[in-house]
Amino acid sequence: MYSTTDFRKGLKIEIDGVPYDIIDFQHFKPGKGGAMVRTKLRNILNGRVIDNTFRSGEKVERPNLESRDMQFLYHEGSELIFMDLTNYEQLHMSEDVTNGKSEFLKDGQQCRVLLYNEKPIDIDIPLTLILEVIETETAIKGDTVSNVTKPAKLETGVVIQVPIFINIGERIKVDTRTKEYIGRE
């Protein structure tokens, strides 16, 4: 169990059976009564942000969260299949849970899977990835107005905007949070 004195940004707590991530907290003492702690919490399961106030010294549960190294094997419909690298068990996860991160998964790629009570709830992928362009339009000579972009399909199937000088077969660096082109590899 955690006490409100243990609170810090990024700490994971559980309230009424739901895991939360502390985004912000502030200790304050009202005119009368004991000290309190105001918090801003993000629900780990659905991403919603709530405000909650705790009495100073109040105890909260520690969630049963675990992060495991896994290898992405393949897509099966809207399911993602991972293999645990320690015991080689397969784990099925819904694409909906990943908040769009599954668009950047390649077969055989390693990542960390966050589990809550042995159920997968999120994946951690690198902030940037090197991916190959498999489909894009060819640039027309003289098309050099500043910052001209075109859509490009990458090897994982995600489509992003790239500069016009990028061609099929080139490897590019992509920001996985914003789905933006960073540069050539």
Curated annotation (Swiss-Prot):
Task: List the InterPro entries.
Answer: Elong-fact-P_C, NA-bd_OB-fold, Rib_uL2_dom2, Transl_elong_fac_P/YeiP, Transl_elong_KOW-like, Transl_elong_P/YeiP_cen, Transl_elong_P/YeiP_CS, Transl_elongation_fac_P
Q: Does the keyword Cytoplasm apply?
A: yes
Q: Which GO terms describe its biological process?
A: peptide biosynthetic process
Q: Which domain of life is it from?
A: Bacteria
**Entry's PROSITE patterns?**
EFP
- State its role: Involved in peptide bond synthesis. Stimulates efficient translation and peptide-bond synthesis on native or reconstituted 70S ribosomes in vitro. Probably functions indirectly by altering the affinity of the ribosome for aminoacyl-tRNA, thus increasing their reactivity as acceptors for peptidyl transferase.
Q: Which PANTHER family match?
A: ELONGATION FACTOR P, ELONGATION FACTOR P (EF-P) FAMILY PROTEIN
Which named protein is this? Elongation factor P
The species is Lawsonia intracellularis (strain PHE/MN1-00)
